[in-house]
Amino acid sequence: EPSTADDDADADEYWYYLKSSGKVANGKQSNVKGQGFVFGNKDDNFGQMLTNWVGGTKDGDSYKYEEIGGEDSVAQLSDYASNGVVYYCMYDEDKADGHIQKNKWRKTWRPEDAYEEDEDEDKYWYWLEKDGKAYIPDSDDMKATGYAYDLGDGALEVDGSQFSFAKKKINSKDYFFNADGEMLSDFVNVVHTEDANVIDLGMYYFGGSSDGSMKTGSQTVKDDNGDSFKFYFGTKDNNTTGEAKGKGVTGNKNNKLYYMGHLVAAQDYKYQPVFMDVAGNGEEATFIVNQNGSIQHSALEYKEDGDILIDAKTNKVEFKTKNSSSKVWDKYSVEKGSLIINVEDIDEKDVMPISTDVIASGSVTSGSKPQ
């Protein structure tokens, strides 16, 4: 049987399955000793048991199957998205017999890297459906484009160029996948969407590479140095407030100030001012925050070691007692009067430096097993 180790097997030898009639099986076979297998049905692979990444190209009412990848292969899983199917038939002489993997996560190499098999960090997570088909998004699934980010040395850093991706719910959790069916992780900034009801513009977080599920609510994330940073992402979709599930909050949330999900807090002084475009219309609201990111809203002198950092008393500054609208979260920003500021303000783009050409704003335009 295929699961039996054979150290003397020649590289050009293949496994075949003979039906009760004595004929060699070919194509997808759903019940070979209770498991599904895929056998070649092309002239150059007829009857050969196909393993690892297997692609089927539509041919009339059936498919023509072949192994994807190899040392000289340039094939991508996305090549089969619109007119084919992809299976993962895990084969290991000691552990797996080559049957179709179903209804599970599988961490493995891309087809073009399958023969290297030397770096675990080059593996990606894929989702295999109940029928065994690997989830490879087609053009109808690809609802958004954006950029991947890593939290490097205290700042989010762009990882690669703009790309397209799809959103999929698996076991009640939301995931993003790229065109080759690779699960995304870390941060993704959505800058273009075809349907804001499916994926809204903004920053999202999916945990580390061993997780990948969309995060909501308060999150603490460590950068490459092990330093912790706080974020807040929407917990549900709410058309009234503009909150979107998983999307990083900008503005006042629970009296803390956030920019695209990142907590904005005083760093160099006990208190610092922040000028932030909360509404996304180019107009900046003025806030005062402390070192915990809590928004201050009293008309007094904000001091440190006897020095006045920010004076909201002299000009009798008034602060907003509620948001300007249901979708503009600027409560406790300055409404009347002007602050006397004796310290540097916090530039949220320094805290979270995202180049302006990839900041999502405005309206819609046309490890271990994942948890």
Model-derived features: positions:
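Extracellular adhesion/carbohydrate-binding repeat motifs centered on closely spaced tryptophans
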Residues: 1-371
